[in-house]
Amino acid sequence: MNWEQLLSLKRQGDKGKRLRVEQDDTRLGFEVDYDRIIFSSAFRSLQDKTQVIPLSKTDFVHTRLTHSLEVSVVGRSLGRLVGKKIIAKYPYLKDAHGYHMNDFGAIVAAASLAHDIGNPPFGHSGEKAIGEYFSIGNGQKYKDQLTAKEWQDLIDFEGNANGFSVLTASRPGIEGGLRISYATLGAFMKYPKESLPKKPTKNIADKKYGFFQTDKAFFEEVAQDMGLIPNKSGLDMGFERHPLAYLVEAADDICYTIIDFEDGINLGLVSEDFALEYLIKLVKDSIDTSKYKTLETKEDRISYLRALAIGSLINDAVKVFVENEALILQGKFPYALMDKSKYKAQMDDIIKISVDNIYQSREVIEKEIVGYQIIQMLLDKFITAFNNKYIGNASNYDALILKMLPEKHHLEKENLYGRLLHICHFISLLTDGNALLFYKTITAAKN
């Protein structure tokens, strides 16, 4: 892979190449991606989607939106720091093509901003609830009518693949969705493969999948345009990662490790003294002890340590990337950057504490149970009504259910897979609050 091709400004529907030197420097081409994402309704819905504590009304607990904004800030720093090194190593990128280190920052920031845009309501349990509706729930009956890969898309519903659809799906009059640049789409694609074969190797890029069967052709177009390296054979499609996808992943890893931990401390799920023991290992080289001692509140002390910890992890992630840049361009770096960080052991310790004390806390478990019930009931009602309408057997009740769908979802789907995936897509874009409201309306539940 080469950087000139990887930094593609091309957008869905373009006939030719967009040149960096022709871009308006007052609003860089890649900055347009960030703007389009942040103004999208799918991004706005993240303000009422949970990050750690489902349905939490506590002000300092992060939603998906605040988490995504923070990941984009970390991603921008990672991109600029790496971009500065890349431009210095390959000066022709600037001299001949006009690329700047800020382009790297803008790409990674935009992809990081969108990294959770396809995730269903109620945290990570939302993905599992959709998958289990098909694998062990009422959706099992559709298995024999789908191909193996279509079925896998449903039983292993993946927020990353759904996010690719959110960013790229066309609607009448809106060709190409948000029309994000190929470079930003490449950085967004942490798992550039289809759902089968499942985890064929230990390569980090094979851990999950990145596109549904409906998006396969366009995914291939984007990958080939940027020169991503194919790594599957026969009828299976997969590619090595776009190098900047490693930075998006690192930004997310850094934020959820440190900031989810911070949420747990502020909620009282992890004691401050216990947390300090682990955070200090990340900041021992940068902490100003005298300043730390002047901070009077727990929130200020933890905030100070969090900022230092994120700074330490950013610098180390950049170091790992730059040291392995040649291997990354060859598609021969099968690890997450933070897996090779000198702080990996410390991060693993913090993640273990978060799993034991935060992710498995009673409040989280209780709310995820509620989320399971809501999502699976909504899937059943809307899929049944949608299919009955298609075959001309819709009841008045089915018609009423379908009237609850926003106008943009009243699209005819000629095949069963398309209809099932369309309803999954609709459910996944609901906020926690809207999903709960739909559930209460359909079940006639009282507040």
PLM regions: where:
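Acidic, carboxylate-rich catalytic segments that either coordinate divalent cations
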Residues: 1-16, 20-23, 393-447
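C-terminal subdomains that position terminal phosphate/3'-OH groups for nucleotidyl transfer/ligation
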Residues: 284-418, 430, 442
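Low-complexity, highly charged intrinsically disordered N-terminal segments
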Residues: 62-66, 70
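Acidic, low-complexity proline/glycine-rich segments
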Residues: 32-44, 339-346
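A residue-level signal for conserved active-site and pocket-lining positions in enzyme catalytic cores
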Residues: 163, 375, 427
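A short small-residue
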Residues: 49-59, 232, 353-358
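Sequence-structural signature of the catalytic-core scaffold of metal-dependent phosphohydrolases
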Residues: 1-26, 38-49, 69, 73-74, ...
